[in-house]
């Protein structure tokens, strides 16, 4: 559910930014201005998003907003995956029973239900 909301938010941001570029490009009637705008847009397309999270400083001194937004979304998604505590959250470890019979063979995150049910029941043969 939470990942669906995040993906919808991400798609909404991408679509609104692309619509904003189309509207601003159609307002200029001068073809020289339109050619200059197209060349600037081509330069933006070849710019990579930095992994450090800092915004990119362009030649004209402006900050690339797409790179800044991409870094912000990447940081947000990493925090959402880690959980609210900042550590990898594992459900059910607080209620772990110390008398559990097969605790040395349990793996974090999954459980073999067939083996567990076979060991819990003692069959009289």
Swiss-Prot record:
Protein name: Cholecystokinin-8
Record family assignment: Belongs to the gastrin/cholecystokinin family.
Membrane-spanning parts: none
Highest taxon in the source lineage: Eukaryota
Described purpose of this protein according to its UniProt entry: Hypotensive neuropeptide that binds cholecystokinin receptors (CCKAR).
The gene coding this protein: CCK
GO cellular component terms listed in the entry, alphabetical order: axon; extracellular space
Propeptide residue interval(s): 21-105, 114-125
Alphabetized PANTHER family for the sequence: CHOLECYSTOKININ
Signal peptide stretch: 1-20
Biological process annotations from GO: digestion; regulation of blood pressure
Localization (cell): Secreted
